[in-house]
Amino acid sequence: MVDLVPPPEAVMDILVKTGAYRRGHFIYPNGKHASHYFQMPLAFRLYDTARILSVGLSRLFRMEKSIAKQIPKVSIISPSHAGIMVAFGVREALSAEQTYWAEIEDGKRQFRQYIDDYEMNPAIIVDDINRSGRSIRETISIVKELGVEVIGIGTIAKFDDAPTDFDGIEAKSLLSFDVNFYDTEDEWRGSRSASDAEVETVRF
């Protein structure tokens, strides 16, 4: 099983080749500047790379006995639309019985209407990137509101300063990445990663 988990170098190679990892000058929605940006859906648009990443993440869950013993009677949950492809890929790799995803509606993260009419299996929360951990924490909250246990958490990539512990559950990832953010353009231009790249405003 371990051989099916791609090393971080292989994961980064996939992200670079598919355009999911980009270098340049990016302004994030919070106004901060960075030299790097991930657009993970570009890696999941291709079957082969999506399969490698999904199987790799799924193996991290299978290697944990407390999770493995509950498969396939588990639900794979994405905190948002961005992680839906990850959720379906991991669901297929684990042969999990259920897949769900949350959405932001009226400023609040929640499931679609009537989801609580059906019994949800123990949950594994997956996403494309763990940036601040906020979406994962909010998803844990709404899952627990349904009386469902969260047994696993994982993402394809995580920022180095992102939280890895959520209520005692270790968040797994295939790649950890050091992204330096700068409050102003002047600060960014003074960094080692600055370039002459044209400014791009990114959106999530």
List the model feature ranges, each with a label.
Residues 71-73, 120-122, 150:
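A general structural motif
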Residues 81-124, 131-137:
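Short, glycine/charge-rich flexible loops or terminal/linker lids adjacent to PRPP-binding catalytic cores
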